[in-house]
Regions:
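Short acidic/polar N-terminal linker immediately downstream of export determinants
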Residues: 4-12, 16-71, 88-106, 122, ...
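Extended, compositionally simple hydrophobic/Ser/Thr-rich segments
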Residues: 33-35, 41-54, 102-104, 109-240
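Solvent-exposed adhesion/ligand-recognition segments of exported proteins
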Residues: 73-78
Length: 240
């Protein structure tokens, strides 16, 4: 019996120590706005619960609004040409009731965007680049306006993605339970792969390659001349 009890006690102790090692920071209610200055960037990587607005403008002046003691634990830095925004290691942030952390990020031209967490990212102006990729992992949401020759999008989580704009070559990979609404993003060639329970709605005009191996559905508008579709799960592929 001791052989079974000792590992359980040891595991419980480790969990307790890990929890106690986290510095819990409760919002103090004092909402302030700070400007964080960085170098330029061509990628944006967010990890956390923040609400992010992407706006057109000169890169390097990041506006961040929230409770003062919460902001002190949020890191904004550029590393390897990527703007990274995340919480300080070892902290557990708890904003006050109804309080948020809102961040405005100016951009001129970025090639990559990623969010890991429960925050939301909204593009207030079009993201324009020849090649652009976006990745969402977690329960957060994307609302993006994209103009790109080549656009790669990945969703792994329960968050939802809403798109508009245009792309000659669109690639979407969905492996979570979230949905992708891209009927307002006009694409010429679309390659869609759904292996989760989420749904994808797209608009393509020339060619469509679609695969469903999960329970999600793919709906498409437009009249692609070339269609290569295959369903190996319980989902479906249909013209909307």
């Amino acid at each position: 019996m001791k052989k079974f009890i000792l590992p359980i006690i040891y595991g419980t102790l480790l969990i307790s120590l890990s929890t106690n090692a986290q510095e819990k920071i409760n919002g103090n209610g004092n909402v302030v706005t700070e400007t964080r200055t960085t170098s330029e960037y061509d990628a944006i990587k967010i990890s956390g619960f923040f609400d992010i607005d992407l706006v057109a403008g000169k890169e390097g002046k990041i506006s961040i609004t929230g409770e003062q003691n919460i902001l002190s634990a949020i890191i904004v830095e550029v590393e390897d040409n990527a703007l990274k925004i995340y919480t300080k290691k070892g902290t557990n942030l708890h904003p006050g009731m109804g309080k948020k952390v809102e961040i405005t990020v100016p951009l001129e031209k970025i090639s990559e965007l990623s969010l890991s967490g429960s925050g939301d990212i909204t593009a207030k102006s079009p993201i324009k680049n020849d090649k652009f990729s976006a990745k969402l992992s977690g329960s957060g949401d994307f609302d993006l306006d994209v103009v790109s020759n080549s656009f790669d999008l990945s969703l792994n989580g329960s968050g939802d993605i809403k798109l508009k704009g245009s792309s000659d070559n669109l690639v979407i990979k969905l492996s979570g339970s979230g949905d992708i609404e891209a009927a307002n993003l006009k694409s010429k060639n679309a390659t869609i792969n759904v292996s989760g329970s989420g749904d994808v709605n797209i608009n393509c005009s020339e060619s469509l390659i679609a695969r469903v191996s999960g329970s999600g559905d793919i709906k498409y508008t437009g009249n692609p001349e070339k269609r290569d579709v295959k369903v190996s799960g319980s989902g479906s592929i249909a013209k909307g």
